[in-house]
Design a protein with these regions (language model features):
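Compact soluble domain cores
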Residues: 21-86
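A generic structural micro-environment signature
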Residues: 7, 36-42, 51, 61, ...
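Short, Lys/Arg-enriched N-terminal segments with co-localized hydrophobic residues
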Residues: 1-15
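Intrinsic disorder/low-complexity signal
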Residues: 9-11, 56, 62, 70, ...
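Short, compact, well-ordered microdomains
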Residues: 80-116
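Context-gated lysine
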Residues: 12-14, 34, 47, 92, ...
Length: 116
């Protein structure tokens, strides 16, 4: 298992669903718990000249990125069922980053797919 590092901040929130217009879909305010990142994800973000903050915000608000329609629907169900949520995003240099919020919402981790 790769060494995990805390990133950005630690925040615990309650999940809130909002009817804010966003193309017809509700926006999640997913509780993230403690934010962690693997060394590979930290390095990939640095090489791409990007921060993980934008990706984390997309994940937190229900934009699951580049996942299949089946996985997108599973993530949407997980908001109410309390299951794990997995998002996938491509960095500017094409490297893929996954963000996983555990079912108990105590930890959200940024990692490379091969670090899973």
């Amino acid at each position: 298992m790769a060494l995990l590092r805390p990133v950005l901040f630690e925040r615990k929130t309650k999940m809130i669903m909002s009817n804010v217009p966003t193309g017809g879909r509700r926006v999640a305010n997913l509780p993230l718990g403690k934010l962690l990142s693997t060394p590979g994800a930290v390095e990939a973000l640095a090489k791409a000249g990007q921060s993980g903050a934008e990706l984390i915000e997309r994940h937190r608000h229900g934009d699951w990125g580049e996942v299949s329609a089946t996985d997108w629907a599973a993530n949407d169900r997980a908001l109410t069922d309390g299951e794990r949520i997995v998002s996938a995003y491509s960095l500017k240099n094409g490297v893929k980053i996954w963000i996983i919020s555990e079912a108990n919402r105590e930890v959200t981790t940024l990692l490379l797919p091969d670090e899973y």
